[in-house]
Amino acid sequence: MPLLEIKNVDISYGKNVTVKNVSLDLNAGEICSIVGESGSGKTTVIRAVLGLIAGGGKVTAGDIIYEGRSLLKLTPAEWRDLRGHDISMIFQDSGAMMNQTRLIGDSYVEYILTHEDISKKDAWAKGVEVIERMRLPDGDRIMRSYPFQLSGGQRQRVGIAMGMTYQPKLLLADEPTSALDVTTQAQIVRQFMELRDEYGTSIIIVTHNLGVAAYMGDKIVVMKRGEVVDQGKREYILHQSENPYTKLLLDAVPTLGGKRYV
């Protein structure tokens, strides 16, 4: 049984259906890359998995099944238990999601205390431990910093640390490398792969970067205007697909010496 199944899902804002008949599944320890142009519905789909569709959007058809149960039928209390523990999300710019006037440690401790009945001192120590596990040296200094005092790569690693605090089975990543320079992008991508290898974490990554999608994804889903127009194993999408839009995306990848590096 797949860890996650998205079955024929429509997502609507009022009477406007913006995501139409989307289906995909994800097995334990698998990485799925969702690619497509801006506005294609990629982010909306993964937000639906976590019950966090922005702007009043709702799932109006289909179902989202996680470990055999419908996420659309969860109570608020069940969502609180699930978010963070079983399913976590990494945002495009984790630093922008943090309160700029609070120490990172204060925000992190507050997050931990929503999930565990422990002392603030123990929560702080846990935050330091997880941050250092994410290859950020001197976790206590990071915890005592404000978000604006860190580089983009450091902020993103803090976001990954917070998302991985309870070693969730499913990690949703929304354009996690788009605001970073190429070197830092590569470091973050490698870190995601290590998380999968070390913890068996399943990952859905939304990206417009086909190179990132191809490097990370066991399977690739291609979206356009709110619909899935192509999907399959990585090798199929990159080398065998006859879908015109998939070919268009591949043709847009820069070449060097006549060779395309995806």
Question: Which positions does each model-derived feature cover?
Answer:
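A short, proline-enriched helix->beta-strand linker immediately N-terminal to the Walker B motif
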Residues: 165-169
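ABC ATPase "signature
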Residues: 231-232
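Conserved ABC transporter NBD signature motif
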Residues: 58-70
